[in-house]
Amino acid sequence: MRGGAGMCFASMEAAGSRGMGKGASRRRTARSTAPVGALVERVVVAPAPVEQQRGAGRPEAHPQSVAARAVVTVRRRRKEDAKDRFAEQLDALADRVGRSVLLELVSTETDPRKGTPKKSKPSALVGWFDKKDVKAERVVYTAEFAVDAGFGEPGAVTVLNRHQREFYIESIVVEGFPTGPAHFTCNSWVQPTRVSRDRRVFFSNRPYLPSETPPGLRELRLRELADLRGDGTGERRITDRVYDYDVYNDLGNPDKGVASARPVLGGEQMPYPRRMRTGRPSTATDASAESRVEYPEPIYVSRDEEFEEGKNEMLSEGAIKALLHNFMPLLVSSVSPDIRDFAGFHDVDNLFKEGLRLKQALHDQLFQKIPFVRKIQENSEGLLRYDTPDIIKKDKFAWLRDDEFARQALAGINPVNIERLQAFPPVSKLDPAVYGPPESAITEEHIIGHLDGMSVQEAVEGSRLYMLDYHDIFLPFLDRINAQDGRKAYGTRAVFFLTAAGTLKPIAIELCLPPMTDGCKRAKRVFTPPADATSNWLWQLAKAHVCSNDAGVHQLINHWLRTHACMEPFIIAAHRQMSAMHPIFKLLKPHMRYTLKINALARQILINGDGVIESGFTPGNVCMEMSAFAYRELWRLDQEGLPADLIRRGMAVEDPSQPHGLRLLIEDYPYAADGLLLWSAISRWCEAYVAAYYPSDEAVQADYELQSWYAEAVQSGHADKRGAPWWPRLSTPGDLASLLTTLVWLCSAQHAALNFGQYPLGGYIPNRPPLMRRLVPAEGDPEYAHLVADPHRFFLSALPSLTQTTTFMTVIDTLSTHSADEEYLGERPDEAWTADPAALAAAREFAADVRRAEEEIERRNADPSRRNRCGAGVLPYELMAPSSGPGITCRGVPNSVTI
């Protein structure tokens, strides 16, 4: 890179205020690298109008001019109602009488006399009226231009929509210039002039660093960035394209009463990442709270962040399932109170079988009077049955075994909390003045008999002791959790021993409650592997509490906070501070698809007060406060990359002799072993890509768009942590490649590992209850006799109720589903995403690396020596296998956080 003043992340204060950025869409793009004549499937080119065939519609090319043509691919809605069809006909008629769509070519060069960009005369898009009845999803229109022979290369196209409706441009290809076809990947909704009188700008696929921007495009680059940043005022309309920041102040609704209010997340009192600003008015009773938009009313995200139709259809089906599965248990339980709890495990099994009681109950006279139920009967066959989760397909009783409980810490849906125990006993970091002595109640006597003849010290020094520690994250909230109806929790620790076979076995579980009164010793109970029938059920209950805490930490912290919320500021900043022409924006673009929309939906129905998360997980109405506590105490970007995270948890040590520079202390740790394959592939890809544009440290430091992106993501997007000393620097190509690797990893592989196994591995509630309703009874408690008398029923009564179970299963069924338009790691459906041959070559090598990683994962899953992923009833670990078909597959690594 050449030119530009030196600036790096070390001088963030200056950088944050003067960057610029470019919004880009998340839409799937056409494969338009072929000549225009070889158009993609389903694209229809209708015959040109008669006038055009006579030559009237095409500008005459003089000897000193160039005749050029723009071929515009417009994607139509698949499903249109009568109102849409009528509006389309009106637009076609308006087009016929001159209210057409106008295109204008902008050269990369400036006029030497005027100093302004060279532009063509506006040209109308031809064929809208003639193709008004075409049924294809993609329809191609053309515009003809005659420009001076010295026009230069087209670097941008402007579009003015004089119709009444918005339309979606997928791509533009401009032909006729000596430099060859110019490709413009658009994937954007263009608003009509009645909404916005500004011309939309689309840049060609040639990447330009800011200092290398051709003279003819500099002004447009600046203007487009300013448009996307907006002015930070006013309420956003759903047609807007503006990206900005706000705190999480719309999760509660204080106008409904104190119980419906929720604290603001973000700010000194409760630090949190920032979310997309909507500018909605405050609530009537609390000026600090933003008024809510309840689902299914649309919540603002930049227009091009909306889902495509295929994604919307998938979520609509999921919404129908939620209605049915939630509505039916509520209906039946209102008539038959005795089935609110599971009477036995057979009731749980019946959820996965055809002919459920819920379905049969539809035939009762009572239900026949309800039109909605009659409609379900007639139209929704198949939506009333849950698929059998993978976790019980191969071995129905595997979940009861200790080895399976331990295996899931390495290869389950939350394999990112297991840590090596480096000192014994474990010690809390909480204030002992408030929470009592920090030492764990687990003693050497509790575990010595389970260490295969080793002493505790030998086991620690030999890296044989591991732990799931949910003590400190839960204990500060336990009083408020346990005060809620039907919710009971502990601060938990589970200690595991690494056997000679390379598998883990649980050897102690500690359940802790806070002190009842000042000076009172808090309750600490330790459970060890059972010796008789009663202790077996106490042990099962203790494991269930560990699993429930694990489920809460997984959803609130590892999944939502780390891969959704903490990524949002980097995405917002990218659109605000980096042009679509910027090579780094082009690299990041597929990894930002759908994330802002998903996060906005989460604020509507998942993480909001009384939403799915609060209703389904033990912490209840303190769920998001726990998430904020974890952000304040635990989150650091420099430890979010896989190698740094493994080292932090003591699961790996640096070893230059190993393929990835790390040696895993549990060799058969499927998440880590497979993750390192993908991490390395992503790292090589980012290094090669960065090297193509940044030959020196100075090139990185002088790129003001790049520096402004990172500075703003930190200073504005993570404002509550902006002064932390651990933020990675952005001063060298190595710094940049490392930062990009971490971000791509979090948006793709890390999110996939934490998301797409939720139903397959968590859909059988006894295996992994998200919510517990009873504490573990002690001998002498009234409940203890109930446990002894009917352990099955007591165990199930501690788990979620039937309604809670079916609601939760429905949600994670939807969350675990790949949509048909998913784009997977290594894929770039838009083959014309860049005109840079070096970048395309690096992308092809990356795709090959990803394929090789998938082949290695398949080999590992077939290796009987890897007992944590292969064996009788053992599920293979495929969550890091990059490819997948649509649906619930328990595999597949999408490019971005798409669900």
From Swiss-Prot:
| Enzyme Commission number | 1.13.11.12
Q: Where is this region: Disordered?
A: 15-34, 48-68, 258-291
Spell out the molecular function terms from Gene Ontology.
linoleate 13S-lipoxygenase activity; metal ion binding; oxidoreductase activity, acting on single donors with incorporation of molecular oxygen, incorporation of two atoms of oxygen
Q: Where is the Lipoxygenase domain?
A: 207-899
The entry's keywords? Dioxygenase, Fatty acid biosynthesis, Fatty acid metabolism, Iron, Lipid biosynthesis, Lipid metabolism, Metal-binding, Oxidoreductase, Oxylipin biosynthesis
What binding details are noted for the cofactor?
Binds 1 Fe cation per subunit. Iron is tightly bound.
Q: Where are the transmembrane segments?
A: none
| Gene3D superfamilies linked to this entry | 3.10.450.60, Lipoxygenase-1, Domain 2 (4.10.375.10), Lipoxygenase-1, Domain 3 (4.10.372.10), Lipoxygenase-1, Domain 5 (1.20.245.10), PLAT/LH2 domain (2.60.60.20)
Please name the GO terms of the biological process aspect recorded for this protein, alphabetically. Answer: fatty acid biosynthetic process; lipid oxidation; oxylipin biosynthetic process
Q: Give the protein's cofactors.
A: Fe cation
| InterPro entries, alphabetized | LipOase, LipOase_C, LipOase_C_sf, LipOase_CS, LipOase_Fe_BS, LipOase_plant, Lipoxy_PLAT/LH2, Lipoxygenase_dom_3
Q: What does this protein do?
A: Plant lipoxygenase may be involved in a number of diverse aspects of plant physiology including growth and development, pest resistance, and senescence or responses to wounding. Catalyzes the hydroperoxidation of lipids containing a cis,cis-1,4-pentadiene structure.
This chain belongs to the protein called Putative lipoxygenase 5
